[in-house]
Design a protein with these regions (language model features):
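Bacterial Sec signal peptide processing site at the extreme N-terminus
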Residues: 14-35
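Structural marker of alpha-solenoid helical repeat scaffolds
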Residues: 32, 66, 100-101, 134-136
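Residue-level recognition of tetratricopeptide repeat
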Residues: 36, 70, 104, 138-140
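Canonical tetratricopeptide repeat
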Residues: 42, 76, 110, 144-146
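TPR alpha-solenoid repeat register
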Residues: 73, 107, 114, 141-143
Length: 160
């Protein structure tokens, strides 16, 4: 084979390879679905931060359709329902988030705050104690403050 036909064959195969890979649906790959889930979750959190809880539910629901076990989407929905004063739904989503990441100090602290708000002080104390075990958690001082307030509510002044 001469050089010219060989180069032509090589170029044709490269072009064919480029064309065939351009047709892949990113939602059919694990990476694509993970990126979409994360984008939907971030969008929902953005709406939540703006106080638009109803709007936050739509992308968070889509995130959970892509990954029903997403701890971040469940945690964000828990906050949505907590703000909307739907304690049963908030509790359900906090539990689902923690079932995926049981040692996550941020989740434990947020769930503890929810439990405190519901006057479930003993449960709140337990969540805060779990969160305090993470010595690298950046909000650890807040966890100790929450522990003290909860101990006071439980009339455990020596712990406070």
């Amino acid at each position: 084979m001469t050089l010219r036909p060989a180069l032509l064959l090589l170029t044709a195969s490269l072009v064919a390879g480029c064309v065939s890979t351009g047709n892949v649906d990113p939602m059919k790959t694990g990476k694509g679905r993970d990126e979409a889930r994360d984008a939907y979750t971030q969008l929902g959190i953005g709406y939540l931060q703006e106080g638009a809880t109803e709007r936050a539910k739509v992308p968070l629901k889509k995130a959970l359709e892509l990954d029903p076990a997403s701890a971040d989407a469940h945690a964000a929905l828990a906050l949505v329902f907590q703000i909307e004063m739907e304690p049963k739904l908030a509790d359900e989503h906090y539990r689902k988030a923690l079932s995926q990441r049981s040692g996550d100090a941020r989740l434990l602290n947020n769930y503890g705050s929810f439990l405190f708000e519901q006057k479930r002080y003993q449960e709140a104390l337990e969540r805060y104690q779990q969160a305090a075990q993470d010595t690298l958690y950046p909000e650890r001082s807040r966890v100790f403050e929450n522990l003290g307030l909860t101990a006071l509510m439980l009339k455990q002044r020596e712990q406070a």
